[in-house]
């Protein structure tokens, strides 16, 4: 099991990235909450990882905080929740927001996530309630702030990456394109475009 990787961020194409560890490139898929915190390409970063082994592939998922990885592991233990839906949930809600949502048994926040209807949201909240009791006493919160100005990206490339990332989360291509196009601010990175688009669709 690969539990943690430290290396140079070689590529960043949401929601995927490549981490160069001593000359070996590890391809990882990350939630948007991790993407927002990543440094510039070429800089060093440490990610906590979870490996999913399938017959046809070995899939590696990366998380900026260990607590995010633990949440991911809790989510994929639930009936009907695979890595894709778990990443979508974590991309649409911060960890502490999801914990508060479970505490309050609030279905409205979950149903904004692609692929989560009312019945699914109700079932997830019931199943997560007991699992999250231990989380209430854990210190620390997640504040989604970037480590600094994002490296400049060509506008067309940033918008294309943002749309692709939203589609990978389960949004329809038209929804994703419309949400990104609706953002009026100029010269934003793909991470900032994704963040604003998700807020706009929430």
UniProtKB/Swiss-Prot annotation:
Homotetramer. Forms an RuvA(8)-RuvB(12)-Holliday junction (HJ) complex. HJ DNA is sandwiched between 2 RuvA tetramers; dsDNA enters through RuvA and exits via RuvB. An RuvB hexamer assembles on each DNA strand where it exits the tetramer. Each RuvB hexamer is contacted by two RuvA subunits (via domain III) on 2 adjacent RuvB subunits; this complex drives branch migration. In the full resolvosome a probable DNA-RuvA(4)-RuvB(12)-RuvC(2) complex forms which resolves the HJ. CDD domains: UBA_RuvA_C. Residues 65-143 are annotated as: Domain II. It holds the Pfam family RuvA_N. Disulfide bonds: none annotated. GO terms for cellular component: cytoplasm; Holliday junction helicase complex; Holliday junction resolvase complex. It is found in: Cytoplasm. This is Holliday junction branch migration complex subunit RuvA. Residues 154-202 are annotated as: Domain III. Its main location: cytoplasm.
């Amino acid at each position: 099991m690969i539990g943690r990787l430290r290396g140079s961020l070689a590529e960043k194409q949401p929601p995927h990235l490549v981490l160069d560890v001593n000359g070996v490139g590890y391809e990882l898929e990350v939630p948007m909450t991790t993407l927002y915190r990543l440094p510039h390409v070429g800089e060093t970063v440490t990610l906590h990882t979870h490996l999913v082994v399938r017959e046809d592939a070995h899939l590696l998922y990366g998380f900026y905080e260990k607590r995010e990885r633990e949440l991911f592991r809790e989510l994929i233990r639930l009936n009907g929740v695979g890595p894709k839906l778990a990443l979508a949930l974590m991309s649409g809600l911060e960890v502490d927001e999801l914990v508060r949502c479970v505490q309050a048994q609030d279905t409205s926040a979950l149903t904004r996530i692609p692929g989560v209807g009312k019945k699914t949201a109700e079932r997830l909240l019931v199943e997560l309630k007991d699992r999250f009791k231990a989380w209430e006493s854990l210190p620390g919160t997640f504040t989604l702030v970037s480590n600094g100005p994002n490296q400049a990206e060509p506008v067309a490339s940033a918008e294309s990456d943002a749309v692709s990332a939203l589609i990978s989360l389960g949004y329809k291509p038209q929804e994703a394109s419309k949400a990104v196009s609706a953002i009026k601010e100029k010269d934003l990175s793909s991470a900032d475009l994704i963040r604003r688009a998700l807020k706009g669709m929430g």
